[in-house]
């Protein structure tokens, strides 16, 4: 593995726990950035040659390096991918009864630029890092080692991919994935538009916020602005809100709001309105 050498004192943030390396922290006289292909894994050294870890590099980015290990010579491979997927899975399974959650959330799970959202038997995978893209065959193999025979959609259409020099595409990698995938969140049933919706089709990162709204909603009138497919409003209605209005600029999203309300028996409480919230 090649070495990425930092300038004097540029190792401080990494030693304090930070995971990113900025291009202006690299000693380009000793390790010229243009010599590294995007997505290559490198050993990170301080100005005195002491190892700081292993990183994925992209020389064209301001954040040119993302740590994947605090040890040198520990690149992501099949074994390490499977281990990190397993650790991430165990942490989610302890928290959620249903198999509906964000399985992998990038740097926080030691897999920078990777998001995997699980909808029971369906996985939606988003990659925004050139190094993870190069590892895609191994990633799919690792997923099958940890939880075999799931249906997998690669929804790689995010804007960050262009910054990494990656093409956009959406395709099935394994099994069959319908346009709308069922999920359960906070005891409420939904359909996620995983092919054409925003991000992975669902915003699992707001799960706890929506649970909080549920506790406040009983007997209230609720306005859900930028409602998307009704994740907030429908949960409020199920929790006992008197009336809910969902506002969004997308007629397609609002059609799904109506479906979500019907799915949970709260169509009489939830109304959708197309419009510009601003």
PLM ranges: what are they?
Residues 104-117, 133-203, 211:
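Non-catalytic substrate-recognition/targeting regions of SAM-dependent transferases
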Residues 99, 112, 148, 266-268:
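Residue-level signal for beta-strand positions within conserved beta-sheet cores that form or flank
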Residues 175-278:
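Rossmann-like S-adenosyl-L-methionine
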Residues 122-127:
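Carbohydrate-binding surface patches
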Residues 1-120, 178:
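Non-catalytic accessory regions of SAM-dependent methyltransferases
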Residues 73, 77, 131, 135, ...:
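Catalytic cores of large soluble enzymes that bind and process phosphate-bearing ligands
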Residues 79, 83, 87-91, 95-97, ...:
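A short, charged
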């Amino acid at each position: 593995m090649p070495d990425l050498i930092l300038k004097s004192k540029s190792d401080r943030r990494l030693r304090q726990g930070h995971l990113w390396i900025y291009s202006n922290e690299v000693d380009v006289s000793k390790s010229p950035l243009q010599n590294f292909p995007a997505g290559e894994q490198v050993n990170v050294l301080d100005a005195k040659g002491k190892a700081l870890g292993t990183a994925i590099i992209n020389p064209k980015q301001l954040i040119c390096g993302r740590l994947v290990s605090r040890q040198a010579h520990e690149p992501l491979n099949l074994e390490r991918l499977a281990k990190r997927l397993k650790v991430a899975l165990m942490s989610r399974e302890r928290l959620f009864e249903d198999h509906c959650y964000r399985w992998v959330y990038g740097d926080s799970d030691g897999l920078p630029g990777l998001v995997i959202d699980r909808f029971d038997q369906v996985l939606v995978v988003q990659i925004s890092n050139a190094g993870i893209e190069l590892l895609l065959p191994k990633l799919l193999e690792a997923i099958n080692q940890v939880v075999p025979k799931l249906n997998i959609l690669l929804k790689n259409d995010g804007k960050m991919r262009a910054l990494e020099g990656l093409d956009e595409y959406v395709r099935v990698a394994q099994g069959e994935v319908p346009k709308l995938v069922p999920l359960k969140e906070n005891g409420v049933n939904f359909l996620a538009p995983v092919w054409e919706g925003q991000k992975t089709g669902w915003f699992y990162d707001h799960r706890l916020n929506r649970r909080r709204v549920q506790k406040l909603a009983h007997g209230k009138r609720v306005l859900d602005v930028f409602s998307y497919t009704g994740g907030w409003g429908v949960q409020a209605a199920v929790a006992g809100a008197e009336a809910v209005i969902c506002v969004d600029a997308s007629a397609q999203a609002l059609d799904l709001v109506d479906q979500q309300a019907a799915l949970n028996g709260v169509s009489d409480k939830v109304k959708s309105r197309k419009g510009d919230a601003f």
